[in-house]
């Protein structure tokens, strides 16, 4: 469950006590003095069979300046913006205060889902405060006692339908990946991918990169309008924003994510949460655009982001931004390509495009590179063609014979797309050196025109379950007939 719940409210209403009860650990400092929680704390909550992320926020303050209270308020507002659900707590014994009314109005405007909870509601002394809470216009309040664990069943009953709704939305947005193929579907020709891009199923693209690489500026340029906040301060986009657009008549859903910093430099808890939100955006994408700053490309964090996308099995496009201010473009481009080949060999051949988000130069190339990467990611190769290719690869470079035992590669087929996944039936799969697997993968890339996309190669022994058993007789003999015709 990827649900995120932010607990918000005035200082000292019991937010950290509830946080500790949901998380099951004393991660948040609890004190009777207002303002003890000065940053955001995140934990994995358990409530019945619900599992979700819970954020304990600093107490909402009315200050809007650069004082500590002002910074706490802004931090809390950002948490409200990125959370799926806000649990707004008041102190039932104190009743509704003017500040509660101010913050209820803020939440009505900033959050799609607000749950009102009247905490410290044990005993008759809290009855008047619970009744007052109705006047906030946020629906019926839940009576809670975070200290004694009362009212959690009622909280569960309110959360459960919202969690189900959000899980369904997440499933609808999640791309199909690791799609199993039916070997009976082929007819000897290269099979077109059935995953057409439509307005109902737009191409899902995540734009990721270090802070201030120009992600929001790039998307604003694609949109043709200022939809996202941009500025020179690193990390100005703190949450992942999803926008559905038609880019050159291609329906897309683009995720602009928080810049991903090195962990040691991520000091604000909110920014740490935003990094994990960016990582989630990678999982929801089909194509990941890794945006680099031309002045400082391929830093360690860039490499980690690209490697994460490859490990998640997503198509990758490298875009180098701020190309308009680069003076020696030819030398710089050669340098970039050499660095790419050396530092990211697992993405050999992936598109590398230079762009200027500021001027719009290079956006056509970026659009075409995204479509090309998506097409390769969906590629399917017929079994007969694969086995013709395998024979040639074996003749050119036979597999090794560890301890005198020759490894025999008998048969190959494609088992998955999105990304392409291939299975080789062979003897002694556990003895196959990694270098020979790389030889086969690199050959697949070169000979079947699959640059850059992740390729999964699985070796199976004869004792493993044969996924092709039971194929129709005419298909089972297709390879034999083909080989006979070659003789």
Curated annotation (Swiss-Prot):
GTP 1 binds at residues 9-16, 56-60, 119-122. Residues 468-487 have a biased composition (Basic residues). Residues 167-191, 458-487 are annotated as: Disordered. The keyword Transmembrane helix does not apply. Residues 167-190 have a biased composition (Acidic residues). Residues 3-167, 203-378 form the EngA-type G domain. One of its GO terms (biological process) is ribosome biogenesis. Transmembrane segments: none annotated. The keyword GTP-binding applies. GO terms for molecular function: GTP binding. Residues 379-465 form the KH-like domain. Keywords: GTP-binding, Nucleotide-binding, Repeat, Ribosome biogenesis. InterPro entries: G_ENGA, GTP-bd, GTPase_Der, KH_dom-like, KH_dom-like_a/b, P-loop_NTPase, Small_GTP-bd. GTP 2 binds at residues 209-216, 256-260, 321-324. It comes from the Bacteria. It holds the Pfam family KH_dom-like. Associates with the 50S ribosomal subunit. PANTHER family: GTPASE DER. HAMAP family: GTPase_Der. Belongs to the TRAFAC class TrmE-Era-EngA-EngB-Septin-like GTPase superfamily. EngA (Der) GTPase family. GTPase that plays an essential role in the late steps of ribosome biogenesis. This is GTPase Der. It comes from Ruegeria pomeroyi (strain ATCC 700808 / DSM 15171 / DSS-3) (Silicibacter pomeroyi).
